[in-house]
Amino acid sequence: MNAQKGFTLIELMIVIAIIGILAAIALPAYQDYISKSQTTRVSGELAAGKTAVDAALFEGKTPVLSEESSTSKENIGLTSSETSTKPRSNLMASVELTGFADNGAGTISATLGNKANKDIAKTVITQERTTDGVWTCKIDGSQAAKYKEKFNPTGCVKK
C-alpha cells in the first residue's frame, strides 16, 4: 500500500475557501481602520495649528497661513511654504483660517482629499476657538462618499 504524500485537491480547495472568507471579512475592517487613522491624523495636525494660533494671539499677533511682511501677523505653519496656501499634509485638499483678528475667536478648517481614503475624501474637520480660548473639534462627513460615525477622531463631534 502506498502512503499518501501531499494534500488532496479537496483539502487545498477548502484552505483557499477559508482564506477567501477571512480576506472578505478583514479587508473592509482594514479600510475602516485606515479611514479612522487618517481623520485622527488630520485632527492632530490641526491641533498643532491650535497651539500656534494660541501663541500668536498671546503675543498680540494675527494668525495667518502664509508668511507676510507685517510684524503684526504670525504664520501658524500649516501650509507647505511661506508663500503658499497649499497644506503641508498630503491628506488635506485645503486648509482655511477664518476669524481670530478681532476678538480671538475663529476657526481652522481642513478638507480631506488628495491621498485620503476615498470613503472620507471631502470630509471637513474644523477646530473652533471661542473668545475665551476654548477649542472645539467638529467634523462634517456629509460630503464624503461613505463616511461613518466611527471615523470621528476622539474628541470631535459631528457638525
Swiss-Prot record:
Region entry Disordered, spans:
64-87
The reply to whether Oxidoreductase figures as a keyword in the UniProt entry is no
* Family annotation (Pfam families): N_methyl, Pilin
Q: Which GO terms describe its cellular component?
A: membrane; type IV pilus
Tell me where it mainly resides: other
Complex and partners: Major component of the type IV pilus (T4P) that plays a role in surface and attachment to the host epithelial tissues.
- What is this protein called in UniProt? Type IV major alpha-pilin
The organism's lineage is: Bacteria, Pseudomonadati, Pseudomonadota, Gammaproteobacteria, Moraxellales
Provide the gene name from the record.
tfpI
